[in-house]
Amino acid sequence: GVLAGVSAAAVHGTRWLDPDAAAELVRADHVRSVPGISVRRAPKLETCVVDGMVATTPAQTAFDLARRMPLDQAIETVDALCNATGLKVCEIEELATRSKGAHGIGAVPRVLTLVDGGAASPPETHTRLLLVRAGLPLPETQIEIFDGDEFVARADMGWKQWRVLVEYDGVQHWTDPAQRTRDVDRYAVLPELGWTVLRVGA
């Protein structure tokens, strides 16, 4: 069989997957699923070999997740897959074009309009979705800030045209003294360079 779905995502290095999710295999013939292993029939797949295991390609994996998972879970998982592999949304769109008629394909465009591999964690994905659903334009992710030629910071997301940054602060930003010190320095400099910083807490 071929590793697919979350199993393929895992072998491609995707983080933050559900450790209790059933393993997923696809085969050209029909085989019954067994406890802990979900087996599906899929005669045409784009595959590759990862560490000696045959798996669906990153693009095929993302396409399959986008058409089978609930919307927010699909966005979060495809974000993480793109972050881990460097996969681009256009590559998934190209595969979708080649896969017309596939079951669930109608869900794929909605997922891909909101996917961004720049998200470095699920909370960053959730923050981005909250901003968009509040009526704001889709933010750019991983914005690099310079003072002349000197690198100052990389922000989680924001809008360059308005010089507004949004930072998701996990628990460590409040509990780690060294991290707090870095944050104080960072957030003192950015306004001096003309940036407004909005901090979202865990």
Annotate the PLM regions.
Residues 1-105, 140:
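Short gly/ser-rich loop at a beta-strand->alpha-helix junction or flexible surface loop bordering the NTP-binding
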Residues 3, 82-202:
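Surface segments flanking catalytic/ligand-binding clefts of nucleic-acid enzymes
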